[in-house]
A protein has these predicted regions:
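Bacterial N-terminal signal peptides that target proteins for export
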Residues: 1-8
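Low-complexity, acidic/polar, glycine-enriched regions of mature
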Residues: 20-208
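Bacterial N-terminal signal peptides
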Residues: 8-16
């Protein structure tokens, strides 16, 4: 009988801890996260580029998405267009201006659930010194252990269109399109799960 009385008391005491811990913090993994973008090139084709997500935190509550959040930093100097001269031009003052503002940052204001796997992050993007509202539709791909069980990972995908002129990138209007299609692939490691060099993909090691 004593145990019957003690058990409810213990459960009552620890319940707030579980409730508080429902929102899990994940550290963005720069090895497996990236931003890919493309823009029209003089009507002939769409040119593709890539940027590195250097750091950030995703907080995600699978039971209440409204408690979730994201804060991510993108290295503008990391832009890769597949050509050294083109990289230099895109980093220049008329476009990304990475010498003056080396990073872009996205910070959420709220997260809205739309379906079992899809939602929208309402937030703001700071780029080239301008901070503007930006909503990111996203999909939760998977949350779980890596195949080797090294850590727990949350994976997300998002696509959005940016108006480059809104951020002051108004040059080359006749040759470069204004609307930039952006594709984000994010993997984030649960807080407390350490990432080691062995976690990273190498030519001799499979993806984890």
């Amino acid at each position: 009988m004593r145990n019957a009385r003690v058990l409810p008391a213990v459960l009552f005491a620890i319940a707030p801890l579980y409730a508080h811990g429902a929102t899990t913090a994940y550290r963005i993994d720069p090895v497996h996260s990236q931003v890919v973008f493309n823009v029209e090139h003089n009507g002939f084709s769409r040119s593709f580029g890539r940027l590195k997500v250097t750091e950030g935190t995703v907080r995600f509550d699978p039971d209440d998405w409204s408690k979730s959040s994201v804060d991510a930093t993108i290295d503008l100097a990391s832009v890769d267009m597949g050509d050294a001269e083109w990289n230099k031009a895109v980093r220049g003052a008329s476009l990304l201006d990475s010498d003056r503002a080396k990073t872009a940052r996205y910070v959420s204001d709220s997260v809205e659930k739309k379906s079992d796997d899809d939602g929208i992050v309402h937030g703001k993007l700071t780029l080239r010194g301008k901070t503007l509202p930006l909503d990111l539709p996203f999909r939760v791909n998977r949350i779980g252990k890596t195949i080797y069980g090294l850590h727990t990972v949350a994976g997300f995908s998002s696509t959005v269109t940016l108006d480059r002129a809104a951020y002051g990138m108004t040059s080359n209007k006749n040759s470069i399109g204004n609307d930039v299609s952006v594709w984000l692939e994010i993997e984030a490691i649960r807080g407390g799960d350490a990432q080691t060099r062995s976690d990273k993909e190498t030519p001799d090691a499979p993806a984890q």
